[in-house]
């Protein structure tokens, strides 16, 4: 009861002060707050680079994908894209924050602003470049056919009626649906590309269509998938980084790429991870 009375008296005093002229300072404070809040809202809506820099971080959407983004044997989160993104963020004066996403819903997460960009071996396509702000190409790639050792393979026609896997929403899936032979296979989508390797290794799939960059790093002698091999190279493609449509960050990242190419950083990383830079 004492608290209620005290609260009532405090409220009455506040109203009395407002009536005696306190409203001017309150109004000024509110106006100042609104004035200071308006630019922040405008920045977030119209200027992604300033928004990212004001937050002090770039939220990067990725999936586990060696050699681009993965955790090594010592428990360190690393990879070509991980190191490159960190170097670019340093040039932009922000910290990278890596957030694991579902690759099949990557565009939705980007549009919802739960991430600032998709930076994870993203294949550049006309559709993606039309609907998102993409950087220039920075790494070369291709889609390859992976099968178990001992498999007879001469062309994609050998996979008609067979079980073929690819990551949902990936360039591999597009390759399957658009290829005259592969489109006649029994296609099963998987959450990530590494799941595709597991299916082929286990014999539950006859072949996987996935990125050359990943296959080169993860299959063959000395790897966990020593019984798998690449037998065909299909679509040649290039990787880029995607931001929201109209974002000015893509251009800033392109400028950082130019600087990192000029000082040899990108080539050093490409050599480290066995990749080929885009021209």
Report the location of each language-model feature.
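Bacterial lipoprotein signal-peptidase II cleavage site
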Residues: 18-35
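Extracytoplasmic small-molecule ligand-binding "clamshell" domains
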Residues: 42-121
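Ligand-binding clefts/hinges and TM-proximal coupling segments of bilobed small-molecule sensing domains
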Residues: 44, 54, 171-191, 226-230, ...
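Extended ligand-binding regions for polar small-molecule ligands
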Residues: 82-91, 170, 240-277
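Short helices/loops that flank or line small-molecule/ion binding pockets
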Residues: 90, 99-100, 104-118, 131-133, ...
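A ligand-binding cleft/hinge motif common to bilobed small-molecule-binding domains
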Residues: 122-130, 175-178, 201-202, 206-235
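Periplasmic-binding protein-like
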Residues: 140-147, 212, 216, 220-258, ...
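Flexible hinge/capping segments at coil-to-helix
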Residues: 147-164
């Amino acid at each position: 009861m004492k608290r209620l009375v005290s609260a009532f008296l405090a409220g009455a005093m506040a109203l009395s002060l407002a009536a005696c002229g306190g409203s001017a300072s309150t109004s000024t404070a509110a106006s100042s707050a609104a004035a200071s809040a308006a630019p922040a809202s405008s920045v977030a809506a119209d200027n992604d680079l300033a928004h990212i820099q004001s937050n002090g971080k770039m939220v990067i959407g990725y999936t586990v994908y060696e050699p681009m983004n993965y955790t090594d044997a010592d428990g360190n989160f690393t990879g070509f894209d991980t190191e490159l993104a960190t170097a670019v963020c340093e040039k932009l004066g922000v910290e990278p924050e890596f957030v694991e996403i579902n690759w099949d819903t990557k565009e939705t997460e980007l549009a919802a602003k739960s991430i600032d960009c998709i930076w994870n071996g993203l294949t550049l396509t006309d559709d993606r470049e039309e609907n998102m702000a993409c950087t220039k190409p920075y790494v070369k790639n291709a889609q390859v056919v992976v099968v178990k050792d001992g498999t007879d393979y001469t062309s994609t026609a050998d996979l008609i009626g067979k079980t073929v896997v690819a990551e949902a929403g990936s360039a591999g899936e597009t390759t399957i649906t658009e290829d005259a032979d592969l489109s006649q296979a029994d296609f099963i989508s998987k959450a990530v590309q590494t799941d595709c390797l597991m299916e082929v290794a286990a014999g539950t799939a006859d072949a996987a269509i996935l990125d050359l960059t990943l296959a080169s790093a993860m299959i063959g002698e000395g790897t966990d998938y020593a019984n798998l091999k690449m037998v065909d190279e299909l679509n040649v493609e290039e990787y880029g980084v995607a931001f929201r449509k109209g974002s000015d960050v893509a251009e800033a990242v392109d400028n950082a790429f130019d600087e990192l190419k000029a000082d040899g950083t990108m080539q050093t990383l490409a050599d480290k991870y066995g990749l080929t830079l885009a021209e």
